[in-house]
Amino acid sequence: MDVRLDHLVCWVSDQLHSLHFYEQVIGLPGVRAEAFREGKAAFPSVRITAETILDLMTYDASMGVEESTGVKGSAGHPINHFCLAVGKEDFDELQVRLKQHGVEITGSGVNSFGAQGIASETMFFPDPDGNVLEVRYYE
């Protein structure tokens, strides 16, 4: 079986504010961003990889989630964090952008195990809604 991660849904309170954070601070390209701004899309997304996006959905949208998934308690079911792997140069540049935008790096580590083996360095920080992101690089 060939499986790929298609998308994640992140609950946010202000979609435009979150879109700005993920585009301008993190540096991820928007998907359907203009259509959302024009009222032609229910939610914006940002592209993580060629095959994976992060949907930015409002808490209000969670009301219909249990009905569509058929899983009791699935609306807003919490995750601990999600992790993005980048190159060393992008990692260093992101640290600068986070500081410029007043985003506190709340945790860090070295030699941390992940999907590609042992990451040289890793950092954790919250998005505007408190969703925790980890960013790391592998050498």
Predicted feature descriptions by range:
Residues 6, 29-31, 54, 80, ...:
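A short, local hydrophobic-aromatic micro-motif
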Residues 57, 66-69, 96, 134:
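Short, charged, solvent-exposed linker or helix-capping segments at domain edges/interfaces
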Residues 32, 63-70, 108, 112, ...:
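A short, acidic/glycine-rich surface segment
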Residues 2, 10-54, 58-61:
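Core segments of cupin and vicinal oxygen chelate
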Residues 4-13, 44-48, 68-139:
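Vicinal oxygen chelate
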Residues 52-54, 89, 131:
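Glycine-centered loop/turn positions within well-structured domains
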